[in-house]
Amino acid sequence: PGPEMATMIERARFAEFYTGPGTNFQDITLEEAIAKATQEKKHIFIECHTDGCVPCKMMKDKVFPHDKMAEYLNREFVSISVDNENGDGPQIMEKYDVQMFPTYIILEPNGELCDIIMSTETDIDLFIKKIEEVKNLK
């Protein structure tokens, strides 16, 4: 198979990961995430990545499947994952001026920005602490 097929397969694997066990990254738009977060009284966690991003893959493989991280994010957030080139990705990257990957955007249930985290923290407790601090800024 050519490079296009390899890219399609990689995207399918990435999508499969985000709907598999671990952190529940929902396949919904930001607008839908805001509506859901408002209804469920949860914050919004946006994971921003790009194809070929090695640190993004490391976080995907080591952090988000972890039971403690998944339990925390699934309980406290409506989580979505966005690619810088697809779906809502380009608009989100522009709106929040995302320049580096991975970047994590934390929003209030109504969609207001809490803050942005740029991190490759693989210590689950430290990463949760960092997210919790940002979530509680307002």
Predicted regions, residues:
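Structural alpha/beta surface segment adjacent to cysteine/selenocysteine redox centers
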Residues: 87-101, 105
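N-terminal leader/targeting and pre-domain segments
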Residues: 2-40, 136-137
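Loop/turn elements at helix/coil->beta-strand transitions in domains of secreted/extracellular proteins
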Residues: 40-44, 75-80, 108-112
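Extracellular/periplasmic catalytic domains that process cell-envelope and extracellular macromolecules
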Residues: 38-39, 71-74, 97-100
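Thiol-based oxidoreductase modules, predominantly thioredoxin-like and allied folds used
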Residues: 24-27, 50, 62-88
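Non-catalytic, surface beta->alpha helical segment in thiol-disulfide oxidoreductase systems
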Residues: 1-11, 99-138
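Local sequence-structure signature of Cys/Sec-based thiol-disulfide redox active-site neighborhoods
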Residues: 30-68
